Curated annotation (Swiss-Prot):
Protein name: Glycolipid sulfotransferase BCG_1434
Job of this protein: Involved in the synthesis of cell wall sulfolipids.
Signal peptide range: none
PANTHER family on file: SULFOTRANSFERASE SULT
Residue sites binding 3'-phosphoadenylyl sulfate per the record: 40-45, 116-124
Species for this entry: Mycobacterium bovis (strain BCG / Pasteur 1173P2)
Pfam families with a match to the protein in the record: Sulfotransfer_1
Keyword field contains Transferase: yes
Family as reported in the entry's similarity comment: Belongs to the sulfotransferase 1 family.
Enzyme Commission number, as recorded: 2.8.2.-
Length: 327
């Protein structure tokens, strides 16, 4: 147990998908790597990059989501997840979508935090929701979570109501944090919210100068994957030459990951996807433009300036080209 870091020092985040109280069951080790990002912001991509460095090659000892589990996800018994991690002899790397203020902050651990243009993350989440078997998710959730802590089904009015992308994006843009930090289990609606994304990135931004916190961005991966892999190696203290980084990066392209989707996509052993390959849909940028009218685009810029400071917004939308977090 993490008795040195009581939960009172952290914000509670609990939903159908995740419960950050589960972190208290894991004893962290010197050298552990925790990868944190909002949904559909490049977390799986970063896991793959870290795996290439930890194992010095493309081969994995098991499915990536078993080797590098989403520890707070509520569909696997925490005892099983912790037992798997405790048995690992290699350097451990663990996935989370919990904001940094909800995690155990340990000087011995490296925190790799990833961002993406929130609009692109929302589009990707829209397609992922269509690929997810929600009934299977609920069955797995109810098999693990005690009855008194389970999420109630969605309100009856929401059942059977097919929402248009326009409706989804309007709610995404205007909605608050879901769930608000610090409250109990909450039913999440739709594809999350813009406020969720910028809140999570904000918890990283104010801690970005800590020596064991490093920021990476989806746009920077797209621009120079080998260069970002080399930078990641340096952050983690793993020896790698530029030529070796270039060789390894070929195994982390979208096509390469899609070709091994049963190994690389998350939760492939849990049966929650209609298609593992569709998890790696396109990986592009700018698809949000088909869902935004000029008025919605203007509203978006008004909204983001309510939610975050200019330097964070520049990085969140463009990576280091927009603003270097080292500043």
């Amino acid at each position: 147990m993490n008795s040195e870091h009581p939960m009172t020092d952290r914000v509670v985040y609990r939903s159908l998908m995740a419960d950050n109280l589960r972190w208290d069951a894991l004893q962290l080790r010197d050298g552990d790597i925790i990868i944190s990002a909002p949904s559909k912001s490049g977390l799986t991509w970063t896991q793959r990059l870290v795996s290439l460095l930890v194992f010095d090659g493309p081969d994995l000892p098991g499915p990536l989501s078993t080797v590098s589990p989403w520890l707070d996800q509520t569909i696997r018994p925490i005892e099983e997840v912790v037992a798997t991690l405790d048995a690992q002899q290699h350097r451990r790397f663990i996935k989370t979508h919990t904001p940094l203020d909800g995690l155990v902050l340990d000087d011995r651990v490296s925190y790799i935090c990833v961002g993406r243009d929130p609009r692109d993350a929302a589009v990707s989440m829209l397609y992922q929701s269509a690929n997810m078997n929600e009934d299977r998710m609920r069955i797995l959730h109810e098999a693990v979570v005690p009855f008194h802590e389970r999420i109630a089904p969605p309100p009856f009015a929401e059942l059977g109501h097919a929402r248009s992308p326009t409706e989804e994006f309007r709610d995404w843009m205007e909605g608050p944090n879901q769930p608000p930090p610090g409250i109990g289990f909450t039913h999440l609606k739709g594809i999350g919210t813009l406020a969720n994304i910028l809140h999570q990135l904000g918890t990283v931004w104010v801690r970005r100068h800590l020596p064991n916190v490093a920021l990476f961005h989806y746009a920077d991966y797209q621009a120079d994957l080998a260069g970002e892999l080399l930078r990641l190696a340096r952050v983690l203290g793993i020896a790698a030459t530029r030529d070796r980084a270039r060789d390894l990066a070929q195994y982390a392209t979208l096509d390469a990951m899609r070709s091994r989707a049963s190994e690389i996509a998350p939760n492939t052993t849990d049966g929650i996807w209609h298609s593992d390959e569709r998890f790696f849909r396109r990986g592009g940028s700018g698809d949000w433009q088909q869902f935004f009218t000029e008025a919605e685009h203007l509203r978006y810029y008004h909204r983001i300036n309510q939610l975050a400071p200019p330097d964070l917004l520049a990085w969140a939308h463009e990576g280091r080209r927009g603003y270097d977090p080292a500043n």
